[in-house]
């Protein structure tokens, strides 16, 4: 690692610790030439993921786009900003894990719905209404009925 003050490439590591929820390593270093101390962060470089669109197009995965869509669905719910960020990070991890460079946009949408359904029913309905292009009240009612049915099944399995 190059020293920011003298550009020497020899340094020693004074301290290492996990950072960013285990996704990177923070290292405190000291230059062997000028004794300047500095901090570096190391993280695994991930391969870019391409999203295969329904129209046949392809674009790079955009975490900000994911965050925007989920944030809109979670407006005025009990989801905090930090919970949304953690939720998006979790979805991103699943996308990277599930894909081998390419992932279908429909797979991302279903992944979000599956996870939102567990976390917040209101956010789930909001996201589903946009993702599945609800045309009217009947679409909302059928989705609410399926939510209601799965809630009853979960309660029955607990009893």
Swiss-Prot record:
Q: Which residues form the ATP-cone domain?
A: 49-139
**According to its UniProt record, which cofactors does this protein need?**
Zn(2+)
PROSITE patterns for this protein = ATP_CONE
What this protein is called in its record is Transcriptional repressor NrdR
The record's remark on the cofactor is:
Binds 1 zinc ion.
| Spans annotated as Disordered | 1-21
Which Pfam families does the entry link to?
ATP-cone (PF03477), Zn_ribbon_NrdR (PF22811)
Keywords from the named record: ATP-binding, DNA-binding, Metal-binding, Nucleotide-binding, Repressor, Transcription, Transcription regulation, Zinc, Zinc-finger
Q: Which GO terms describe its molecular function?
A: ATP binding; DNA binding; zinc ion binding
State the gene name recorded for this protein.
nrdR
**Where is the sequence biased in composition, kind Polar residues?**
1-11
């Amino acid at each position: 690692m190059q020293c920011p003050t003298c550009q020497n490439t020899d340094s020693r590591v004074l301290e290492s610790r996990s950072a960013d929820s285990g996704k990177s390593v923070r290292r405190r270093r000291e230059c062997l030439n000028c004794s300047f101390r500095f901090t570096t962060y190391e993280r695994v470089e991930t391969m870019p993921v391409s999203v295969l669109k329904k129209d046949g197009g392809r674009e790079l995965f955009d975490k900000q786009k994911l965050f925007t869509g989920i944030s809109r669905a979670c407006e005025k719910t009990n989801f905090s900003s930090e919970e949304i960020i953690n939720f998006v990070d979790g979805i991103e991890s699943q996308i990277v894990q599930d894909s081998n460079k390419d992932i279908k946009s429909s797979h991302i949408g279903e992944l979000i719905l599956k996870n939102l359904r567990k976390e917040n029913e209101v956010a789930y309905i909001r996201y589903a209404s946009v993702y599945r292009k609800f045309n009217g009240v009947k679409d909302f009612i059928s989705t609410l009925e399926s939510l209601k049915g799965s809630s009853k099944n979960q309660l029955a399995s607990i009893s």
